[in-house]
A protein has these predicted regions:
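Flexible, solvent-exposed loop segments that connect beta-strands
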Residues: 72-78
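Terminal amphipathic alpha-helical/low-complexity segments used for targeting or macromolecular assembly
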Residues: 1-28, 131-185
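Short glycine-/acidic-enriched loop or helix-start segments at secondary-structure transitions
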Residues: 47, 120-121, 136-137
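Glycine-centered loop/turn positions within well-structured domains
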Residues: 49, 124, 132
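Short glycine/threonine/proline-enriched tight-turn/helix- or strand-capping micro-motif at secondary-structure
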Residues: 17-22, 40, 45-46
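Short juxtamembrane and helix-loop transition motifs at transmembrane-helix boundaries
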Residues: 17, 67, 71-72
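Left-handed beta-helix
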Residues: 33, 38-39, 44, 54-55, ...
């Protein structure tokens, strides 16, 4: 089959992100059940077999995951390679960078813009460049449970992914209720 025919078959009805994800998986990347990789993510396509993503993982938009580091090559030392392992029940915030040779445990939240340069143990919330532990996952849960008792809950309006169906009145109500802080869906 010609390259053009192969590309045409691969692209039929699929987004470029779906095609990229299929490529990564077919070349050895592990992606667990119920895991989501949002748009704009850059996952190292040169070394996909070195990357493992667990179950129930959400990777927010524009996250970068690298299994190599070419910076040593600048001083003629070669390119460094290392496995990236992301555990189960993990949220990685937008624009975070996960560098090679890192392991992220289970039940972890990584804040937006964080740079993961070393292993992150399970049951923690991490943020910063480099990422450092902010609190335990249980402290984070408790903080949000307390907030949910006093802040607006929009579950009765629409699910977050159905916002396009919300009426103008529902959108205005949400804006007013969020004037002085956050809410939940």
């Amino acid at each position: 089959m010609s390259l053009f025919a192969t590309l045409k078959r691969l692209l039929r009805g699929k987004s470029s992100q779906e095609v990229e994800l299929e490529y990564l998986i077919s070349h050895g990347m592990h992606l667990g059940k119920n895991s989501t990789i949002n748009s704009g993510c850059l996952i190292d396509s040169g070394w996909p077999w070195l990357i493992s993503i667990g179950e129930h993982v959400t990777i927010a938009p524009n996250v970068t995951i690298l299994a190599h580091d070419a910076s040593p090559d600048v001083v003629a030392c070669g390119t460094k390679l290392g496995k990236v392992s992301i555990g189960n029940n993990v949220f990685i915030g937008p624009r975070a960078v996960i560098l090679c040779n890192t392991r992220i445990g289970d039940n972890v939240v990584i804040g937006a813009g964080s740079v993961v340069t070393h292993d992150l143990p399970s049951d923690g919330v991490y943020a910063g460049a480099p990422a450092v532990r902010i609190c335990s996952i249980e402290e984070y849960r408790q903080k949000n449970r307390c907030l949910m008792e006093t802040r607006p809950y929009f579950g009765d309006i629409r699910r977050w992914d159905d916002w396009r169906e919300s009426t103008d009145e529902e959108k205005e109500l949400m804006k007013r209720q969020l004037e002085d802080g956050c809410g939940f869906i």
